[in-house]
């Protein structure tokens, strides 16, 4: 199970808007996509098609609204598109309910960010350090 290059770029940008870098690394740098890639072969296998369809639709929504791929949008516009997806205010056709995809994306991003580093995310235990868990 593998994402297309476009889906990977969209995923990378989306997870970094859900958990953006600040004084600590964001979701991408913390290994969330590594976690998700591993989980697509395991627990997320049943949701893989929804993930792929959602990422493709998220990018299509960005193209329809801004004539740019999601990964190329400004952070403000990425946040705007994600808010519209969260509330279901989309103008393109989605094969998965937009709000359901948003919920899946947020939940699995948080899982990867706060998971045990042995699961592929939370690189260098960054999120645990952030919350004071040693």
Which sequence ranges carry the predicted segments?
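Mature-region segments of soluble proteins
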Residues: 8-13, 17-21, 31-134
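C-terminal segment of N-terminal export signals and the immediately downstream linker at the start
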Residues: 1-9
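Aromatic-lined, polymer-binding surfaces characteristic
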Residues: 25
């Amino acid at each position: 199970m593998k994402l297309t290059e476009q889906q990977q770029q969209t995923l990378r940008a989306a997870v970094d808007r859900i958990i953006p870098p600040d004084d600590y690394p964001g979701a991408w740098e913390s290994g969330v996509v590594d976690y998700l890639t591993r989980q697509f072969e395991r627990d997320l296998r049943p949701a893989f098609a929804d993930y792929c369809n959602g990422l493709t639709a998220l990018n299509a929504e960005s193209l329809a609204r801004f004539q740019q791929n999601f990964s190329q949008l400004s952070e403000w516009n990425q946040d705007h598109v994600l808010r519209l997806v969260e509330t279901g205010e989309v103008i393109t056709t989605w094969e998965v309910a937009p709000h359901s995809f948003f919920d899946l994306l947020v939940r699995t991003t948080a899982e990867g960010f706060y998971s045990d580093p042995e699961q592929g995310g939370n690189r260098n235990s960054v999120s645990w350090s952030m919350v004071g868990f040693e």
